[in-house]
């Protein structure tokens, strides 16, 4: 039986401030660093080892992976970074407070932007200072690959090529893999692995800093999945993610 570990980065500063983060390169909070270290401890105590790791090009995911590998004494394994594992791009919402945005546009509209499958938020203009095309880390991308806004469908379409062409072949070779990424890029993979419908993916929330273990058969079909750690704390963390888009009372 094959085990694949998925890990959303620890709490970032904009998670704490309840902002749409997207491709903005915000760092972890102290709590986020603690979550990452604890994830590494849980994995070590659970007897997990890894041969190769994958992450995005955003520091909150990279630093989370560093902390995990440090806690497991695995900092020597190969780490591959790709923009394809980045968070979903939130377009013109990036940097805005989620509760304030809900007050302005309504909770239902913000839920659609946050969690629907095929409705992207309002797009950025290329002249906007938040447009990622001017950043050196994306210099090798074609202009059409750099998003102005993304829905989850766009994120799935961005993520699956690296899964099929790079990650899945490594797993089939017998390599033990961890993917440290973001809430929506991981939701994209979870949707694929569990064959979740476009309607049901709306209700899937992935908490920060808690390892999600997938057990796969030889054809990489999902047999079951589960989170490591305290289940009561897990429920609170999932509920907290679900409530982020609600208007402040």
Swiss-Prot record:
EC id: 5.4.2.11
Protein name (database record): 2,3-bisphosphoglycerate-dependent phosphoglycerate mutase
Keyword Isomerase: yes
GO terms of molecular function: phosphoglycerate mutase activity
Species this protein is from: Pelodictyon phaeoclathratiforme (strain DSM 5477 / BU-1)
A Pfam family recorded for this sequence: His_Phos_1
Sites where the protein binds substrate: 8-15, 21-22, 60, 87-90, 98, 114-115, 183-184
Catalytic function, reaction form: (2R)-2-phosphoglycerate = (2R)-3-phosphoglycerate
Positions marked as site (Transition state stabilizer): 182
Keywords: Gluconeogenesis, Glycolysis, Isomerase
GO biological process, one term: gluconeogenesis
Main function: Catalyzes the interconversion of 2-phosphoglycerate and 3-phosphoglycerate.
Organism domain of life: Bacteria
């Amino acid at each position: 039986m094959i085990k694949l570990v998925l890990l959303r980065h620890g709490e970032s500063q904009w998670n704490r401030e309840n902002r749409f983060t997207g491709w903005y390169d915000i760092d972890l909070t102290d709590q986020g660093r603690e979550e990452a270290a604890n994830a590494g401890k849980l994995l070590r105590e659970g007897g997990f080892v890894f041969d190769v790791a994958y992450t995005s090009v955003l520091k909150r995911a990279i630093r989370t992976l560093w902390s995990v590998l440090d806690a497991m004494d695995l900092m020597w394994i190969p780490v591959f970074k790709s923009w394809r594992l980045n968070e979903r791009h939130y377009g013109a919402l990036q940097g805005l407070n989620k509760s304030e945005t809900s007050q302005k546009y309504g909770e239902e509209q913000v839920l659609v932007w946050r969690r629907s499958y095929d409705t992207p938020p309002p797009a950025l203009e290329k002249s906007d200072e938040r447009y990622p095309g001017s950043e050196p880390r994306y210099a090798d991308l074609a202009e059409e690959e750099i998003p102005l806004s993304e829905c989850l469908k766009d994120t799935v379409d961005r993520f699956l090529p690296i899964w099929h062409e790079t990650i899945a072949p490594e797993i089939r070779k017998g390599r033990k893999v961890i993917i440290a990424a973001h809430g929506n890029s991981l939701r994209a993979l979870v949707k694929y692995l569990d064959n979740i419908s476009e309607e049901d993916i709306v209700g899937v929330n992935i908490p920060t800093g808690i390892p999600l273990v997938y057990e796969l058969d030889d054809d990489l079909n999902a047999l079951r999945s589960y989170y490591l750690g305290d289940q009561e704390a897990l429920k609170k963390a999932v509920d907290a993610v679900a409530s982020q888009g609600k208007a402040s009372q």
